[in-house]
Amino acid sequence: MTDQIYYETMYILRPDIAEDEVTNHIDKYNKLLEESGGKILDSQMRGKRRLAYQIAKHREGIYVQLSHQGDGQHIFKIEKAMRLSEDVIRYLTVKQEGPLPTPRSSNKGYNQSEKKDIESIDSTNKSEFKEEANDKKTATSESTSSQGKESQKS
């Protein structure tokens, strides 16, 4: 495993399975991935969500996201296991450009000075927009009044 590549696998489980079965599936796929040479970076259950379209007569599904690293050989085993499982209704694995981004801090990614900068930019943009709108109104009213004067001369 000299050449490590980052992957993300998202799979959808049937909505009617019990919560302990969901945990068993997550553990099973995590264990299978590690046994086949992959390294788990992050595993998250995203919860039950409505599907965009019906899949295998289901309108909802339980989403699970799995971020992992490996040489690529481990993907075949995990996808084969998902394909053979009746509880997995859809799965997709994509190659990532690099490692996972670091999670944002609890202040939602903005400090107070950045927030003030954004607010000042917003107020500047609003005032410039109002000035442009006023200029257009003035130009339109001037051209309308000059056209009216020309028609009176004729």
Curated annotation (Swiss-Prot):
Stored PROSITE patterns: RIBOSOMAL_S6
Region (Disordered) location: 94-154
Listed Basic and acidic residues bias regions: 113-139
InterPro entries: Ribosomal_bS6 (IPR000529), Ribosomal_bS6_CS (IPR020815), Ribosomal_bS6_sf (IPR035980), Ribosomal_S6_plastid/chlpt (IPR020814), Transl_elong_EF1B/ribsomal_bS6 (IPR014717)
GO CC aspect terms: cytoplasm; ribonucleoprotein complex; ribosome
Biased composition (Polar residues): 103-112, 140-154
Pfam families xref list: Ribosomal_S6 (PF01250)
CDD domains recorded: bS6_chloro_cyano
GO-annotated biological processes: translation
Molecular function as annotated in GO: small ribosomal subunit rRNA binding; structural constituent of ribosome
Domain of life, per lineage: Bacteria
Entry keywords, A to Z: Ribonucleoprotein, Ribosomal protein, RNA-binding, rRNA-binding
Function: Binds together with bS18 to 16S ribosomal RNA.
Family note: Belongs to the bacterial ribosomal protein bS6 family.
Official protein name in the record: Small ribosomal subunit protein bS6
Gene: rpsF
